[in-house]
Amino acid sequence: MAKTIKVTQTRSSIARLPKHKATLKGLGLRHIRHTVELIDTPAVRGMINQVSYMVKVEE
């Protein structure tokens, strides 16, 4: 089974760069305290790094 990570949005996407809003949407995050479980891939890690100031990651 593939390794998964839990990603939780901790800050609002209001007044953020459109690119960062699109990244949150790509991760499947919709609002503050929304948590999704994603497969740990380099693409997902890159998206998380881009919006690291708005999300919390649990291995």
From Swiss-Prot:
Species in which this protein is naturally found: Actinobacillus pleuropneumoniae serotype 5b (strain L20)
Enumerate the UniProt keywords alphabetically: Ribonucleoprotein, Ribosomal protein
How does it associate, per the subunit comment? Part of the 50S ribosomal subunit.
HAMAP family hit by this protein: Ribosomal_uL30_B
Looking up PROSITE patterns in the UniProt record yields: RIBOSOMAL_L30
| Name the record gives this protein | Large ribosomal subunit protein uL30
Biological process (GO) annotations? translation
Q: Does the keyword Ribosomal protein apply?
A: yes
Instruction: Provide an example Pfam family for this protein.
Output: Ribosomal_L30
InterPro entries given in the database record? Ribo_uL30_ferredoxin-like_sf, Ribosomal_uL30_bac-type, Ribosomal_uL30_CS, Ribosomal_uL30_ferredoxin-like
The leader peptide range reads: none
Matching entries from CDD domains are given as: Ribosomal_L30
Q: Which GO terms describe its molecular function?
A: structural constituent of ribosome
Q: Please give the superkingdom of this protein's source.
A: Bacteria
Q: Would the keyword Ribonucleoprotein be found if you checked this record's keyword annotation? A: yes
